[in-house]
Amino acid sequence: MLKTFSIGGVHPHENKLSAHQPIITAEVPAKAVILLGQHIGAPAKPVVAKGDVVKVGTRIAEPAGFVSAAIHSSVSGKVAKIDTIVDASGYAKPAIFIDVEGDECEETIDRSKTLVKECDLSAEEIVKKIADAGIVGLGGACFPTQVKLCPPPSFKAECVIINAVECEPYLTADHQLMLEHAEEIMVGVSILMKAVKVNKAFIGIENNKPDAIQLMTKVASSYAGIEVVPLKVKYPQGGEKQLIDAITKRQVASGALPISTGAVVQNVGTAFAVYEAVQKNKPLFERVITVTGKSVARPSNFLARIGTPMKQLIDACGGLPEDTGKVIGGGPMMGKALVNIDVPTAKGSSGILIMNRKEAKRGEAQTCIRCAKCVSACPMGLEPYLLGALSENGDFETMEKERIMDCIECGSCQFTCPANRPLLDYCRLGKGKVGAMIRARQAKK
């Protein structure tokens, strides 16, 4: 019997329209806009100024705190300005604007396709190279990888879990990455194991990707301690806590860190980026992004430079369809509608979903009918109908007591609601307000 997580979950239509589309190297943009806050934590601090000349891979911003990440130029050219731009979240964020000239790369970066298996570095040296390369979690959370690889002394890592689930509908970037770079991913997994000093790793893949399971299992057989675990298809299996539950049958307690279960979870794209950083001296300046939608002429998977305008990738797929109703950064369950399509891609950009007008139209919200479908669907064991009502009424103190901070914003509640209640919107609002309350309390101590 296939493994899966134990609480809640839903089954949205997969719509993997770009599955098995080879990864296309996107054109280098004429201008790149590289955000300074592409990760959880403090935005990076610029180390370049207007007029400076940069190459592909040049560090242009340094970490501004313990939880932060370095930023590197994805292009060669000249810094035009440091200013703000509205990003995919809809907020104005600081960014470095670069006018592209040529495509000159830093000499230390190995751009060859030669596989490098052996890694003689110590755990500490590996973590430093990962930090220097600006690696973050590529599954969406964008947590700085070097921080995750150095858990508090009171916790001990027992295994590495690689998230290759890609449960979000439409997105296929991770699937195609496994099909084209299985060997490099395995080396990356081995490096992660060495970094956290464990001898066991699990790669979780849902069984709607049989080709990836077969290939990754075959390649893993040559690497000590790595096991591919086929999983039952259920959303949101790619959630960190849900994946730990599915593979180890250990549940992360409310308010606890995932490392409390002994598991260090990394995305499969992150494992590939770790390989490139440690074995090829390549910083994180490009990633695979799916551009898709039912009306899109050519749904595709692109290897795109960070800072490429999303419009450029959309145009490479045939442009915006006439019946476009909404453009989503990410997937339909957890993604957010874009204010405009000129926003730049970032480290966390996994996909661009173009929805037609029929798909994009929301049903009119009705009064809650107390059916409890949202309660059954919630993978965190919360009561979304209650959280929604509390958020709507501004009762954020009670929301905190009802564990709103445990919400992973997966959208399962809203997906299953027959009354079309905007439950995810309410939960996001409440979570933001409660988070601000908690930070204010801590600041007074």
Predicted feature descriptions by range:
Residues 1-47:
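N-terminal, Lys/Arg-enriched amphipathic/low-complexity engagement segments
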Residues 86-143, 154, 210:
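Acidic low-complexity segments
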Residues 349-365, 375, 379-445:
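Ferredoxin-type iron-sulfur electron-transfer modules in oxidoreductases and energy-metabolism complexes
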Residues 77-79:
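Conserved hydrophobic positions within beta-strands
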Residues 49-62, 81:
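Short, well-structured beta-strand-loop connectors
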Residues 106-107, 137, 160-174, 295:
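Gly-rich Lys/Arg/Thr-decorated short loops/hinges at beta-loop-alpha junctions or inter-strand turns
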Residues 198-310, 316-321, 331:
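Hydrophobic alpha-helical positions that pack around
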Residues 179-195:
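Histidine-anchored nucleotide/phosphate-binding helix
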